Swiss-Prot record:
UniProt protein name: Bis(5'-nucleosyl)-tetraphosphatase, symmetrical
HAMAP family (alphabetical): ApaH
Family: Belongs to the Ap4A hydrolase family.
GO molecular function: bis(5'-nucleosyl)-tetraphosphatase (symmetrical) activity
Species the sequence originates in: Actinobacillus pleuropneumoniae serotype 5b (strain L20)
Matching SUPFAM superfamilies: Metallo-dependent phosphatases
EC number, UniProt record: 3.6.1.41
Reactions mediated catalytically: P(1),P(4)-bis(5'-adenosyl) tetraphosphate + H2O = 2 ADP + 2 H(+)
PANTHER family the UniProt entry points to: CYTOCHROME C5 (PTHR40942:SF4), PTHR40942
UniProt cross-references to Pfam families, sorted A to Z: Metallophos (PF00149)
Keywords: Hydrolase
Its biological purpose: Hydrolyzes diadenosine 5',5'''-P1,P4-tetraphosphate to yield ADP.
InterPro entries: ApaH, Calcineurin-like_PHP_ApaH, Metallo-depent_PP-like
């Protein structure tokens, strides 16, 4: 049995299949975990959703910001972005089933055997492990509730940019969602920054990657994330694994086999 974790798909279904072929993936014995953002920029977002949803493939994902945006567009509260290739999802006969399945996916997974944390964008530098898990479950409960559409319609803001246990309602939920699905850089005081999308070496001096801030969790815990393609897999910390390597942007799809930490890649198909 092997445990495989793959970075952001963004509709790159054929590349995923070639990666799995490289390792002779056997869903009867092996596990496949994904860092979210199954959909958007690649041509086969529908196929990605159906593959991960199908129990026979033994695949599990967490939610990314593009997955949440897809939910918002399916609900009619946001428009499809010009470069997103999701028309096939809107036309699919199983659209409602896919929508319901997607909103029931987690924001955070702790692997039951190995204990690593799987998140799309990151973990707040202000949270310990207990808070991290509790906040994920809290936000997931909203997405799985009957009033999730009201919250999704209000998630498109950058505030609050810091954590307070006193936050309630949409502000609290929005901070949690932004941490798990959008975060990249933070200030030294642990406030979130959403303006900078530059590579780390080109970012202003006052900004640091979230995983470089002072939080014991970032030293004690194995953390796997996607979202940040410009890192190109380099987090420069032995227990932090960045798996989004921009396949949808013309680079490659990355997968790690957890047992021996071997990396497998598949170049973007033309």
């Amino acid at each position: 049995m092997a445990t495989y974790i793959v970075g952001d798909l963004h509709g790159c279904f054929d590349e995923l299949q070639l990666l799995l072929k490289q390792v002779n993936y056997n869903p009867a014995q092996d596990e496949l975990w994904l860092t979210g953002d199954l959909v958007a920029r690649g041509a086969k977002s529908l196929e990605c959703l159906r593959f991960v949803k199908d129990p026979k493939n033994n695949a599990k994902t967490i939610l990314g910001n593009h997955d949440l945006h897809l939910l918002a567009t399916l609900l009619g509260v946001k428009k499809v972005k010009p470069n997103d290739q999701v028309d096939a999802i809107f036309a699919a006969e199983d659209r409602a089933d896919l929508q319901n399945w997607l909103r029931n996916q987690p924001l955070l997974i702790q692997h039951p055997k190995y204990g690593f944390l799987l998140t799309h964008a990151g973990i707040s530098p202000e949270w310990n492990l207990t808070e991290t898990i509790a906040c994920a479950r809290e936000a997931e409960a909203v997405l799985q509730s009957g009033h999730y559409a009201d919250y999704i319609a209000q998630m498109y803001e950058n505030t609050p940019d810091h954590w307070s246990a006193e936050w309630q309602g949409i502000e609290r939920w929005r901070y949690i969602i932004n941490v798990f699905t959008r975060m990249r850089f933070c200030y030294a005081d642990k406030r979130l920054d959403f303006a900078c999308k530059l590579p780390v070496e080109d970012a202003p001096n006052e900004l640091k990657p979230w995983f470089k801030l002072d939080n014991p969790l970032f030293h004690q815990q194995d953390i796997i994330f996607g979202h940040w393609a410009s890192l190109m897999g380099k987090a420069d910390k032995p227990n932090i694994y960045a798996l989004d390597t921009g396949c949808a942007w013309g680079n490659h799809l990355t997968m790690i086999r957890w047992e021996d930490k071997q990396i497998f890649t598949q170049e973007r198909l033309k």
